[in-house]
C-alpha cells in the first residue's frame, strides 16, 4: 500500500503544474498587442498617445500614464501624437499675393491661396500672375483657384477685343433683333456694327449746349475789362499823388540829413566888380530866397527918364497892366506851401542864359503872397563862386559903383527871373543905401544920381505911412538911421582917410558890438570879408527862418586892378567869434550923396536876420 501511495503524489503535483501553466498561457493570449494609432509601447507597456490639439509633455512609466498639454496660440496639432511640441501655422503674406483661405485653429492648420488673377507655381513655390488672353481668345470658365488661365479661341459669332485673364468670348450684337441693319459684320476680334434704317439727324437743341459757357466767358471778360478801367482811373488820380508824396518824403528826409551834415559847412562866397575913383562901393543887404510878385497899381516904378518923374513924386496916374518880378521875404507858411515843388539842381542854375543888365531889382511889401521861382535853397561849395547862385552874372569891370546911368524909378521893363534881377542890381551898382533902413528917409531914397550933390531929391513914393513901399521893403529889422550913423562913425579911422579899407581891416572891425536897438544875430555865422551867411537853423535847408546874405562889391571874376584876393570861407566855431563878419567893418562913402556921403556911412551897415515872416 505504501509504494502505491508514493506513486500517486508525483502524479498530483504534475497535474497541478499543468493546470497553472494552462492558466498562464490563456492570460498571455487574452492581452491585446500595442498596434493602435492611439497607443504606443514604452517600457514593456502599451501607453496612450495625446489627442489632436495637445502635445505630450512626458511619457508613461511603469506606474503612470502619458502627460499631455494644449497647444499655444498660432500653433496646432491635427492628429493623435506623441510629439513634444505643437506645429506653427503658415503665414499668408499679402505682399506675395497670398490670402488665408482657412484661418486654422489648434486642431486644423491654416491654408493659404493666391489672390484672384494669380496662381500657385510649384517651380518657385510662389504666386504668379495669370496669363492674359489676347484679343480673339477668351478665358475658359469656370476659373480654377490657384490655377493658371486657360485661353481658347473664340467661336464663330463670338469675339474678344481686349487683353484679359478672366473675360470669355462675347457674342456679336444681333442687329436684326434690334430692328437695324448690319453695317459691318463682326469678327473674332470685333463686334458687329449696326446702323439705323432712318437717316440720322442732329438734335435741335445741340447749339444751346455751348451757349451758357459762351455767355459766362463773355460776362467774365466784360467784368475784367471794367475792373481794369476803374483801376487805371483810380491809379491815375490817387496813385500819382501817393507816388509824389513818397518822393517828397524821401527828398525831405535826404534834405534833413544833408542839412545836418552841412549845418556847420561853408557858405556861398561871391566877388563882384571893383569900382574906381572917389565913388565908394555900394553894399546892400539882399535876401537869398527869391519870389515873383506883381506891382500894385499905385506903386511907383521906373521910367526911362533915369530919375523920379512927376507921376512918381506926385502920386499921379500909373501905367496899368504892367507886371514886374518882385523879391520878397519868405515866411514859414509860404515855404511849406511850396514844399511840393521840384528841387532844382545845380546844373539848372549853371546852365541858365544870361539876361540884360538894364533891369532893376524890386521888393514887395511885407505880407504879400508870392510864388518863389525855386522852392529849395541853392547849395554852393566852399571853393565855388557865388555867381552860380545867380545865372547870367558877369564881371563888370568898366562899370562904376552906383553909376546911375540906368533909371532908378521908371523904365521900359522886361520880366526876368528874380535871381537875375538880384545879380544885375549888384553888378550895375544900383545898391540903394536905404535898403536895410527900418525907417528910411524917403527924401534921400529917390535921389537922382545925376543931380549935383547937395540938391534936394524928391522921394520915390513917399513915406511908408502914406503910400506903398519903394523898391526896398521897410521894416526888415535893420538898425535905425541914427544908430547906424553913430556906429559907423566910431568904426571909421580917426585920420579921416579914405573910407574904403581892405577886407582885413573891415573884418577886424567886425568884432565890435552889435548895432544899438537890435539884438545880435543868432545862429551860425559863416564866410569871410566878401560874404556872410546868417541863419538860425540849417543853412541850406531851412523852413521859416530868413537867411540874409551880405554881398561885397569886390569881385575876383573881373580884371579889376584894385580887387583883393578872395578869402576862403570859414565856419565860425562859436557865436562869440565874429571876426569875419563883413558887415561890422567901416562903410564906404555914398557916391550919390556928395561930400556928405563921404563922411556919413551908409545906412545898410549890418545885416540882421529876421525871425520869421511875422517880423517882416
Swiss-Prot record:
**Disulfide bridge partners, by residue number:** 34-46, 47-60, 50-68, 71-86, 92-112, 114-127, 124-126, 133-151, 154-169, 175-194
Instruction: Show the ranges annotated as biased composition (Low complexity).
Output: 499-508
Q: Show the ranges annotated as biased composition (Basic and acidic residues).
A: 483-493, 570-580
| TM segment ranges | 213-233
**Where would one find the signal peptide in this protein?**
1-29
Q: Which residues carry this modification: Phosphoserine?
A: 580
Q: Which Pfam families match?
A: RANK_CRD_2, TNFR_c6
Among Gene3D superfamilies, the record links this protein to: Tumor Necrosis Factor Receptor, subunit A, domain 2
- Per the record, what ranges lie on the membrane's Extracellular side? 30-212
What does changing residue 53 to R do?
In OPTB7; two patients with osteoclast-poor osteopetrosis
GO biological process terms, alphabetically, are: adaptive immune response; cell-cell signaling; cellular response to zinc ion starvation; circadian temperature homeostasis; lymph node development; mammary gland alveolus development; monocyte chemotaxis; multinuclear osteoclast differentiation
Q: Name one GO cellular component term.
A: membrane raft
Residues at which Na(+) binds: 133-134, 160
Cytoplasmic compartment ranges equal: 234-616
State the function annotated in the UniProt record: Receptor for TNFSF11/RANKL/TRANCE/OPGL; essential for RANKL-mediated osteoclastogenesis. Its interaction with EEIG1 promotes osteoclastogenesis via facilitating the transcription of NFATC1 and activation of PLCG2. Involved in the regulation of interactions between T-cells and dendritic cells.
| Disease note | Familial expansile osteolysis: Rare autosomal dominant bone disorder characterized by focal areas of increased bone remodeling. The osteolytic lesions develop usually in the long bones during early adulthood. FEO is often associated with early-onset deafness and loss of dentition. Paget disease of bone 2, early-onset: A form of Paget disease, a disorder of bone remodeling characterized by increased bone turnover affecting one or more sites throughout the skeleton, primarily the axial skeleton. Osteoclastic overactivity followed by compensatory osteoblastic activity leads to a structurally disorganized mosaic of bone (woven bone), which is mechanically weaker, larger, less compact, more vascular, and more susceptible to fracture than normal adult lamellar bone.
Provide the protein name.
Tumor necrosis factor receptor superfamily member 11A
Which species is this record about?
Answer: Homo sapiens
Amino acid at each position: 500500500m505504501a509504494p502505491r501511495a508514493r506513486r500517486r503524489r508525483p502524479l498530483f503535483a504534475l497535474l497541478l503544474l499543468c493546470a497553472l501553466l494552462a492558466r498562464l498561457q490563456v492570460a498571455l493570449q487574452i492581452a491585446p498587442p500595442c498596434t493602435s494609432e492611439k497607443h504606443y509601447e514604452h517600457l514593456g507597456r502599451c501607453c496612450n498617445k495625446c489627442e489632436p490639439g495637445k502635445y505630450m509633455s512626458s511619457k508613461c512609466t511603469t506606474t503612470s500614464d502619458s502627460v499631455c498639454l494644449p497647444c499655444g496660440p498660432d500653433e496646432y496639432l491635427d492628429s493623435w501624437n506623441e510629439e513634444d511640441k505643437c506645429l506653427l501655422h503658415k503665414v499668408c503674406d499679402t505682399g506675395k499675393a497670398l490670402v488665408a483661405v482657412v484661418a486654422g485653429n489648434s486642431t486644423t492648420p491654416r491654408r493659404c491661396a493666391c489672390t484672384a488673377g494669380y496662381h500657385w507655381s510649384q517651380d518657385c513655390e510662389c504666386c504668379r500672375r495669370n496669363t492674359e488672353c489676347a484679343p480673339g481668345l477668351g478665358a475658359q470658365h469656370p476659373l480654377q483657384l490657384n490655377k493658371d488661365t486657360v485661353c481658347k479661341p473664340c467661336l464663330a459669332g463670338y469675339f474678344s477685343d481686349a487683353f484679359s485673364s478672366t473675360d470669355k468670348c462675347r457674342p456679336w450684337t444681333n442687329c436684326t433683333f434690334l430692328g437695324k441693319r448690319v453695317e459691318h459684320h463682326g469678327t473674332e476680334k470685333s463686334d458687329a456694327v449696326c446702323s439705323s434704317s432712318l437717316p440720322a439727324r442732329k438734335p435741335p437743341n445741340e447749339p444751346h449746349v455751348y451757349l451758357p459757357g459762351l455767355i459766362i466767358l463773355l460776362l467774365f471778360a466784360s467784368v475784367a475789362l471794367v475792373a481794369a478801367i476803374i483801376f487805371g482811373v483810380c491809379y491815375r488820380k490817387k496813385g500819382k499823388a501817393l507816388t509824389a508824396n513818397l518822393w517828397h518824403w524821401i527828398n525831405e528826409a535826404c534834405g534833413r540829413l544833408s542839412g545836418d551834415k552841412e549845418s556847420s559847412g561853408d557858405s556861398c562866397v561871391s566877388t563882384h566888380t571893383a569900382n574906381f575913383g572917389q565913388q565908394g562901393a555900394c553894399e546892400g543887404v539882399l535876401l537869398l530866397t527869391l519870389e515873383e510878385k506883381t506891382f500894385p497899381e499905385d506903386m511907383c516904378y521906373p521910367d526911362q527918364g533915369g530919375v523920379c518923374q512927376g507921376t512918381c513924386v506926385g502920386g499921379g496916374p500909373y501905367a496899368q497892366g504892367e507886371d514886374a518880378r518882385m523879391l520878397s521875404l519868405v515866411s514859414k507858411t509860404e515855404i511849406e506851401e511850396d514844399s511840393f515843388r521840384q528841387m532844382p539842381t545845380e546844373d539848372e542854375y549853371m546852365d541858365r542864359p544870361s539876361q540884360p543888365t538894364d533891369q532893376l531889382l524890386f521888393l514887395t511889401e511885407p505880407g504879400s503872397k508870392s510864388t518863389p521861382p525855386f522852392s529849395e535853397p541853392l547849395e554852393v561849395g566852399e571853393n565855388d563862386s557865388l555867381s552860380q547862385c545867380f545865372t547870367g552874372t558877369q564881371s563888370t569891370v568898366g562899370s562904376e559903383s552906383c553909376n546911375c546911368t540906368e533909371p532908378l524909378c521908371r523904365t521900359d521893363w522886361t520880366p526876368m527871373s528874380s535871381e537875375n534881377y538880384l545879380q544885375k542890381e549888384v553888378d550895375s551898382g544900383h545898391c540903394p543905401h536905404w535898403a536895410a533902413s527900418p525907417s528910411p528917409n524917403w527924401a534921400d531914397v529917390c535921389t537922382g544920381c545925376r543931380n549935383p550933390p547937395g540938391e534936394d531929391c524928391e522921394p520915390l513914393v513917399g513915406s511908408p505911412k502914406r503910400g506903398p513901399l519903394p523898391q526896398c521893403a521897410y521894416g526888415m529889422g535893420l538898425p535905425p538911421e541914427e544908430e547906424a550913423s553913430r556906429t559907423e562913425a566910431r568904426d571909421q579911422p580917426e585920420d579921416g582917410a579914405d573910407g574904403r579899407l581892405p577886407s582885413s581891416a573891415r573884418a577886424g572891425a567886425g568884432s565890435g558890438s552889435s548895432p544899438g536897438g537890435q539884438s545880435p544875430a543868432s545862429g551860425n555865422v559863416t564866410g569871410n570879408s566878401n560874404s556872410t551867411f546868417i541863419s538860425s537853423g540849417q543853412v541850406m535847408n531851412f523852413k521859416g527862418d530868413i537867411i540874409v546874405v551880405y554881398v561885397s562889391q569886390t569881385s575876383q571874376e573881373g580884371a579889376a586892378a584894385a580887387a583883393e584876393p578872395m578869402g576862403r570861407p570859414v565856419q565860425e566855431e562859436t557865436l562869440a567869434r565874429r571876426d569875419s563878419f563883413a558887415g561890422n567893418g567901416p562903410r564906404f562913402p555914398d557916391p550919390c550923396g556928395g561930400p556928405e556921403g563921404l563922411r556919413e556911412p551908409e545906412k545898410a551897415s549890418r545885416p540882421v536876420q529876421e525871425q520869421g515872416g511875422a517880423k517882416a
